[in-house]
Amino acid sequence: MKIFFVSSSSIALEVFKEIVKHYEVVGVLTLPDKPKGRGQKLSQNVIKLEAIAKNIKVFDPLILDDNILNLIRDLNPDLMLVFSYGKIFKKEFLDIFPKGCINVHPSLLPKYRGVSPIQSAILNGDCVSGITIQNMALKMDSGNILVQKNFKIKSCDTSYDISKLVSSLSPNLVLEALEKIGKGFLGIPQKSSEATFCSFFKKESGFVDFNLSAFEIKNRINACNPWPLARARLDYGDIIFHRADFLKIDLYKEKKVGEIVDFDSEKGLFVNTGEGILLLLEVQRPGRRVLDYKSFYNGSRQLIGQVFSSIGGVY
């Protein structure tokens, strides 16, 4: 089976490496190079670099015009495999592939159709999520399910953590799906009545409101790592939050919302909220390295009693 691989994200790298071992990958579609770093030099993503290293034809157009479509047709691909590309395809493009098109989606479809399934699962405090290998349909994330696998989300897991987990679990699931396709399996239709949807995170998604419950705040902090990163303000500047947990206790009701009320070397830095205690576990001052809560506290012993304020904006 000749496979045409489509991705622009490192989350798909392990799948790409595994597929190349078992199938003929005739081409790769990815996004154009992007400026990166202080010098804003154009940088190739890891999928493109890996494809070049394996001498696989790479397409990185701004738009899929007729010329690009014809070049892809000339490769005579049987099937397209898509994992985190970031654009929606027209029927004309999908019709190029006689054995169809499949997609790796990091949620238990039909839950969390859309662009931010990992972040949304964490933001909503889900304890379980998963991976779906689906046939692609014109309607976003609505195709028949070929393979699904669930996994647990721990309370302090971040989107970065879950992305790494998805990256490691996906290769075997894709191989299983391709084997099923080879045997004529058409997949199981989704229950559209159970579909939920998720949208893009914005920079403002990382603004923390300490009037919310500790549970809601820790979910937002963990969901926003690695982007846009949650943050709030102390007297001397912004503090970026990379990881958090929470306690269902209300021992500090007399304290201000957002006030740093305690430090526990085994649990974290305690912050009072609208309900419960937020445990800050990993934090950062802008331009400096990320610190665990112990190092942050040891470097700022006057933290207790200081009060975080929200930066503003809307979620």
Curated annotation (Swiss-Prot):
Family to which the UniProt record says this protein belongs: Belongs to the Fmt family.
Keyword Protein biosynthesis among UniProt keywords: yes
Function according to Swiss-Prot or TrEMBL: Attaches a formyl group to the free amino group of methionyl-tRNA(fMet). The formyl group appears to play a dual role in the initiator identity of N-formylmethionyl-tRNA by promoting its recognition by IF2 and preventing the misappropriation of this tRNA by the elongation apparatus.
Species name: Borreliella afzelii (strain PKo)
InterPro entries (alphabetical): Fmt (IPR005794), Formyl_trans_C (IPR005793), Formyl_trans_C_sf (IPR037022), Formyl_transf_N (IPR002376), Formyl_transf_N_sf (IPR036477), Formyl_transferase-like_C_sf (IPR011034), Met-tRNA-FMT_C (IPR044135), Met-tRNA-FMT_N (IPR041711)
Gene name of the record: fmt
Name of protein: Methionyl-tRNA formyltransferase
Xref: NCBIfam families: fmt (TIGR00460)
Taxonomic lineage: Bacteria, Pseudomonadati, Spirochaetota, Spirochaetia, Spirochaetales
Keyword Protein biosynthesis assigned: yes
Keywords associated with the record: Protein biosynthesis, Transferase
